[in-house]
Amino acid sequence: MTVAITQTGPALQEFIKRHQRLFVLSGAGCSTDSGIPDYRDLHGGWKRPQPVTFQAFMGELSTRQRYWARSLVGWPRFGLARPNATHHALAALEARGQLELLLTQNVDRLHQAAGSQAVIDLHGRLDVVRCMGCEQRMPRTEFQLLLERDNPGWADLEAAQAPDGDADLDSVAFDNFVVPACPACGCVLKPDVVFFGENVPRERVERAFAHLQAADAVLVVGSSLMVYSGFRFVQAAARAGLPIAALNFGRTRADDLLSLKVEQSCAQALAFLQQPPDPLHTATARYHSARSA
């Protein structure tokens, strides 16, 4: 497939206007304007060391100490992040009646905060902590109080924000950091997100694929698609013959599958969605949505 590359928005606008049931796959590039760093450079490589793996987190106390210490320092800023223009634009796309599903690889819940409702959090949500024994869950804000109680002084440390709601603590020893256990059963507590090396819950994947089957096109926003859990949906769309557009700076894993690629700020390229829609186009979108319901 020949990839059409443009530096401006008109081609993307036309792509979106042509389709009434868009399957949108979003990534870290959606949230950078909210102050949350992304993971990859323009070539798709890591900007920093790879995130912790599920196996290391579950198997090594030292890994959990390092993870939760960095999270204790970084969470307050992450938790205060607010939706930006990209999140609001995608919420507007849903309000226009053109969204089949917003499948996000992000764990920040900013799409929901902007008003999006048809959302699946592919990799979970960082604002919840889950016990790996009894499955009890608690808000991340509540767990923050436990971390600060057991580790006085750590909350006063200053460090640069990192992508996973944590902070870059490079010259700190974690040996004496206390990791609270589950108050109910004493087992390991983990953020309710999918770590590297951990499987996305099957039910979540199946729901997303069901929506993909009902879609008439795919739009990738702010993702290089280097992680297979997201890339496989684009692969499936290509096999089904769906047109695929990507809005992302730099290389994506799906470049040879795209019918359109736009390298432009997500907020700028999608700004038109927050303008009053053409009445005829809106009526047409609602008609198609009603017929396929």
Curated annotation (Swiss-Prot):
Its cofactor is Zn(2+). The keyword Repressor does not apply. It comes from the Bacteria. Its main location: cytoplasm. The active site is at residue 123. It catalyses: N(6)-acetyl-L-lysyl-[protein] + NAD(+) + H2O = 2''-O-acetyl-ADP-D-ribose + nicotinamide + L-lysyl-[protein]. GO terms for cellular component: cytoplasm. NAD(+) binds at residues 27-47, 105-108, 222-224, 248-250, 266. One of its GO terms (molecular function) is NAD+ binding. Its EC number is 2.3.1.286. Binds 1 zinc ion per subunit. The keyword Cell wall biogenesis/degradation does not apply. It is found in: Cytoplasm. Zn(2+) binds at residues 131, 134, 182, 185. InterPro entries: DHS-like_NAD/FAD-binding_dom, NAD-dep_sirtuin_deacylases, Sirtuin, Sirtuin_cat_small_dom_sf, Sirtuin_class_II, Ssirtuin_cat_dom. It is an enzyme of class 2 (transferase). Keywords: Cytoplasm, Metal-binding, NAD, Transferase, Zinc. Residues 1-284 form the Deacetylase sirtuin-type domain. Gene3D superfamilies: SIR2/SIRT2 'Small Domain (3.30.1600.10), TPP-binding domain (3.40.50.1220). It holds the Pfam family SIR2. SUPFAM superfamilies: DHS-like NAD/FAD-binding domain. HAMAP family: Sirtuin_ClassII. NCBIfam families: PRK05333.1. Belongs to the sirtuin family. Class II subfamily. NAD-dependent protein deacetylase which modulates the activities of several enzymes which are inactive in their acetylated form. This is NAD-dependent protein deacetylase. The lineage of its organism: Bacteria, Pseudomonadati, Pseudomonadota, Gammaproteobacteria, Lysobacterales. The gene is cobB.
